[in-house]
Swiss-Prot record:
Glycans are attached at N214, N225. One of its GO terms (biological process) is carbohydrate transport. Residues 1-34, 97-108, 164-170, 261-290, 348-351, 414-423, 487-523 are cytoplasmic. This is Sodium-dependent lysophosphatidylcholine symporter 1-B. The keyword Glycoprotein applies. It comes from Danio rerio. Its main location: membrane.
């Protein structure tokens, strides 16, 4: 037989066969649900503000409150914990309100995103302003931190739930999620670069104390000039305000691009059920086994990365001695994470999302061990930071890639209960933000108990030991707990594809029913 002869015969035979009605419907459905690259990019850009501001707050707010606003560590821990706890409470509340929002000409999610943006930008800017009245600093930061978190929640919860309304196809949603995660990690890179580099150019000198004496009684840092530290401190405060102004401008631009470039699609699968109460929503989402296991697993792994994020700047300054380089180390982590997102998207497509969780999360452990055990070396720290960024990328991508699978599983098991996507997303954000509040509050309070010295050139041994625990031992334990929970997570690739097929059948049946009803009304 000549080469290609059999293939030609097979092709001719295939062309004579008519596709089945189901194949025709599926092809039309997939074509209609396909997203353009432009739409995916505009959708992805909308996720940047949350990550840019979150990265700036996560990496720099703790050190800002301690060494720039000059707050006592105890009050700083209260601000960080109350702000994140309040933020966590607002997530399910906003999710509940979004789920009851009627459909408008702009959709159900877009009005929340647009209206919250200008007020969120104002509150974010005021977080990085130091009021002149010392007695009112704590109240100032509490008010504007909580207000910003509330307004950002009004942006982020609808934006997260928008994933379910940009397309009905899992493949398209996963692709859009990959675009989004790439831009969001790029957003953390931008946030780290803007905040770190602008602030890094205006470093205020540290203050020598009695613990800065070596065994001979001489100061370790005798060249530090503290005759008038207020001048340099004011420059540092101005640098924080400049950085916040730049971030506010980016926030507004991203919101405009999202609004103009993304069209929210109305789900045609089923008519939405009657709105449920807030506590009914809690029972509904937590009563769905796959969702509860997914959230609990990522709760512990996210807490590990949040502990690392919140304390790594202090660890670089006081344990590793990189006071003038810590912002560059953070930048390397975020740059590596940005570059690794396409790899993890390919990996989860090739080997499955559950496998990606195990490989991606555990890859950070060697970094956590090396930064504590290996003697301080800037070159080694850069290499380890680049390797850690690969794991950070997985931590960004996987939760948002797996949440739509859980929502789809709920729809398959509860076909009569629809329109609750925002509740699922908001409760996930609630748990992760609550974990973030706990991590920041506990870590800052631990530093207070250990004897943290505000703007000190060095710190007591107890503080350095506490920082080692917060960036190494504690995250490793939390990662292990999270991975043990993921063992019982039931949605594998086979289950996911089965749910996809069932949902497509539901949508096709619903569209057929609507078509039949229309024809009967015409007759």
């Amino acid at each position: 037989m000549a080469k290609g002869e059999g293939a030609e015969q097979y092709t001719n035979t295939s062309l004579l066969q008519k596709p089945s009605p189901d194949e025709v419907k599926l092809a039309k459905h997939e074509t209609k649900s396909r997203l353009s690259v432009c739409s995916k990019l505009c959708y992805a850009i909308g996720g940047a503000p949350y990550q840019i501001t979150g990265c700036a707050i996560g990496f720099f707010l703790q050190i800002y409150l301690l060494d720039v606003a000059l707050l006592d560590p105890f009050y700083a821990s209260i601000i960080l914990f109350v702000g994140r706890a309040w933020d966590a409470v607002t997530d399910p509340t906003v999710g509940f309100l979004v789920s009851r929002t009627p459909w408008t000409r702009f959709g159900r999610m877009m009005p929340w995103i647009v209206l919250s943006t200008p007020f969120a930008v104002l509150c974010y800017f005021l977080i990085w302003y130091v009021p002149s009245v010392d007695q009112g600093k704590v109240v100032w930061y509490l008010i504007f931190y909580c207000c910003f978190q509330t307004l950002q929640t009004c942006f982020h919860v609808p934006y997260s739930a928008l994933t379910m309304f940009i397309s009905t196809e899992q493949k398209e949603r996963d692709s859009a999620t990959a675009y989004r995660m790439t831009v969001e990690v790029l957003g953390t890179l931008i946030g780290t670069a803007i905040q770190g580099q602008i602030v890094g150019m205006a470093n205020a000198p540290c203050i020598s104390t009695e613990i800065d004496l070596n065994s001979t009684g001489l100061e370790v840092a005798p060249d530090v000039n503290i005759t008038d530290p207020h001048v340099s401190l004011q420059d540092l405060r101005n640098a924080y305000m400049i950085a916040s102004g730049v971030i506010c401008a980016i926030y507004v631009v991203c919101a405009v691009v999202l609004f103009l470039g993304v069209k929210e699609q109305k789900d045609t699968c089923r008519v939405r059920t009657e709105p449920m109460s807030f506590f009914q929503g809690i029972c509904m989402v937590m009563g769905h086994g796959p969702y509860a296991k997914l959230v609990m697993g990522f709760l512990f792994t996210s807490l590990a990365f949040m502990l690392l994020e919140g304390n790594f700047a202090l660890f670089c300054i006081y344990n590793l001695g990189f006071r003038n380089d810590f912002q560059n180390v953070l930048l390397v982590i975020m740059l590596s994470a940005t570059l690794a997102i396409p790899f993890w998207q390919w990996f989860l497509t090739k080997f499955g999302k559950k496998t990606a969780v195990y490989i991606g999360t555990t890859s950070v452990v060697p970094f956590l061990i090396s930064v504590v055990l290996v003697p301080s070396s800037l070159a080694v720290t850069y290499i380890a930071s680049f390797a850690a960024g690969v794991s950070v990328a997985a931590a960004f991508l996987l939760p948002w890639s797996m949440l739509p699978d859980v929502v789809d599983d709920f729809k398959v098991q509860n076909p009569e209960s629809q329109g609750h996507e925002a509740i699922f997303y908001s409760f996930y954000v609630f748990f992760t933000k609550f974990a973030s509040g706990v991590s920041l509050g506990v870590s800052t309070l631990s530093l207070d108990f250990a004897g943290y010295v505000t703007r000190g050139c060095t710190q007591p041994g107890e503080v350095k030991l506490t920082l080692k625990i917060l960036v190494s031992a504690a995250p490793i334990v939390l990662i292990i707990i999270g991975l043990l929970i993921f063992i019982s997570y039931p949605i594998n690739e086979e289950k996911r594809q089965g749910n996809r097929k069932l949902l497509n059948e539901q949508r096709e049946n619903e569209m057929d029913s609507e078509t039949d009803s229309t024809e009967l009304n015409v007759v």
